[in-house]
């Protein structure tokens, strides 16, 4: 287990080697009940074995990273990532960003704010357009009340479900003892104008039954260079339910980018 000090914040990181000196692939996990392990157990290994160096990290307040009381807005997330790349010496060339769900939101925001840092984007069923900010804020507010009024972490621990107990305790701390919900509520959805400003290639991988697919189609229409890959038979949880198809799409895209750079 490694920690890296980035902009005064201790972030839990994990690196996997690649071959050669190609761009690093940085994975950004989802919100609240997630951490770097979701990628470590799915895409990170195959991507590393294909020759691409990998960086995973627990975002601010998640997993084994430090949990400050505030700073959960998108601009601060970009600053955290920028500081992390600098601390690891990975800011000298653009990196590939792979974001799942809200991690995709942060990856896209990074590409818009710091296009010099991003070689390409892979967005996995990320929330892009529509009323997702309000919907997610409402959902998390209800969850916060439920966690505050229950003893779920203790009950799970008593049943021997230690991993679930840790996740529940972390979610309780994030939702009830930080500004995460307030910071999320201040965000706005992306627009076609935002998509048109993207300077890097984008691969968007979505489930055929996902409620977020319309936003991905809008992205594909508006972005200068975007491939939309729709995986059949799954909804939002593409990373876990369609790992094989997702992995194939990601490796194909990374291989194509490596070939383009080499050529």
Language-model features and meaning:
Residues 234-244:
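Catalytic histidine-centered segment of alpha/beta-hydrolase-like enzymes
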Residues 12-64:
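Conserved HGGG/HGGXW glycine-rich cap/lid loop of the alpha/beta-hydrolase fold
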Residues 164-194, 208-209:
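Hydrophobic, aromatic-rich cap/lid helix
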Residues 1-10:
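N-terminal cap/lid segment of alpha/beta-hydrolase-fold proteins
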Residues 202-234:
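Conserved loop-alpha-helix segment in the C-terminal half of the alpha/beta-hydrolase fold
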Residues 55-98, 248:
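Active-site loop/oxyanion-hole signature of alpha/beta-hydrolase fold enzymes
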Residues 108-112, 121-149:
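Flexible "cap/lid" loop of the alpha/beta hydrolase fold
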């Amino acid at each position: 287990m490694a920690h890296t000090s980035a902009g005064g914040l201790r972030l839990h990181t994990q690196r996997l080697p690649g071959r050669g000196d190609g761009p690093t692939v940085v994975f950004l996990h989802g919100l609240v009940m997630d951490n770097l392990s979701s990628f470590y157990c799915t895409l990170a290994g195959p991507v590393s074995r294909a020759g691409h160096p990998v960086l995973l990290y627990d975002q601010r307040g998640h997993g084994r990273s430090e949990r400050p009381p505030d700073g959960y807005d998108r601009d601060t997330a970009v600053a955290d990532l920028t500081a992390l790349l600098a601390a690891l010496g990975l800011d000298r060339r653009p990196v590939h960003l792979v974001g799942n769900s809200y991690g995709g939101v942060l990856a896209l925001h990074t590409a818009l704010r710091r296009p010099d840092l991003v070689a390409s984007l892979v967005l996995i069923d990320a929330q892009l357009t529509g009323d997702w900010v309000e919907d997610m804020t409402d959902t998390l507010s209800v969850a916060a009340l439920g966690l505050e009024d229950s003893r779920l972490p203790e009950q799970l621990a008593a049943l021997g479900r230690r991993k679930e107990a840790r996740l529940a305790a972390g979610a309780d701390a994030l939702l009830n003892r930080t500004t995460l919900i307030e910071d999320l509520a201040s965000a706005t959805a992306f627009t076609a104008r935002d998509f048109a400003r993207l300077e890097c290639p984008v691969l968007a991988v979505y489930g055929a039954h996902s409620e977020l697919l319309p936003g991905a189609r809008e992205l594909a229409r508006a972005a200068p260079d975007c491939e939309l890959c729709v995986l059949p038979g799954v909804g939002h949880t593409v990373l876990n339910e369609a790992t094989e198809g997702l992995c194939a799409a990601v490796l194909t895209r990374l291989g194509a980018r490596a070939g383009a750079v080499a050529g």
